[in-house]
Amino acid sequence: KIRPLGGLREGARGERGEAADMVNFTVTGQGLLTLRPGVRALELPFGFDTRGQVIRGLWAGFLGRGEFLAVATSPAGEYGANGDYIQVFRRKEEGFAAAALLPRPFGAKTAWVQFFTFCGELYALSDQGYLRISDGGISTVDTPGFRAQAVEAYVPLVVTGASPAGGGTALEQVNRLTNRRRISYSADGSAAYRLPEEAVGVAAVQVSGESLDSPGSFDAESRVYTFRTPPAAGTDNVEITYLAASSDRARVLGMRCSETYNGDTDTRLFLYGDGSNTCIYSGVTQGGAPSAAYFPAMNEIRVDGADAPITGLLRHGG
């Protein structure tokens, strides 16, 4: 055991108590660092075919009352007929049994996949996409199956109480996962509604809670949306979902590691591991629900200098 811990000093031999690489350590009950005892190969107690495939990610844990193992693979060679897979196994009394085979979940050759659970659901994040794995997909004869679906990014309400001429009050932060943002207006009988400077298009329009199919047109140069029939006056009764030119989605998909935190409820998901000194974390939607589909742009923590990438996060206690 190392006592006391002198910290991490990468690229140097260091003094006693300092670690040159933050790998293969675990924390004891006394808060000390100790080396892990090592690993040994075990024969898998179930059929698992990896011919032509490379394992890109593994996860084991509980979903509901069941214990599962998830394995992500992608082809060792070119991506073609031999695509990527996620295989899910359920533990039974006699051992693990196949629960699902999810072919081409990312639709591209992955370099890595990290699995994590958040609010009782299983997610798979990779350099090629972000998936939520849930019941209802391909299944075996006697075992409930699973399906992998792309995580639908939460669209934040960034401005509320705006007049058709603009203004309003800032509410939610933009979501790194998407270039979509919402703004609500209090109609005054006008037909023309000015959008923020970042708007390059309009994706959806609601009036008094009803979604309308192309009720007007958007002029990208003036950033004005014009209704063919002006909405009736009201308070926050017009909502326009607009598009920004870009998003920070690639930053999220570059995070290889995760940790959950926030007391007993674990309402925050922290992502890190893109080679920077920054970790980002999820937020809470307007309705008050924690969401793995919402990473507010300002929810980040920078540690030390830019030349000191984060190599590990640990939830300690609680």
Positions of PLM-derived features:
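Short, hydrophobic/aromatic-enriched beta-strand segments in well-ordered soluble domains
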Residues: D236-A244
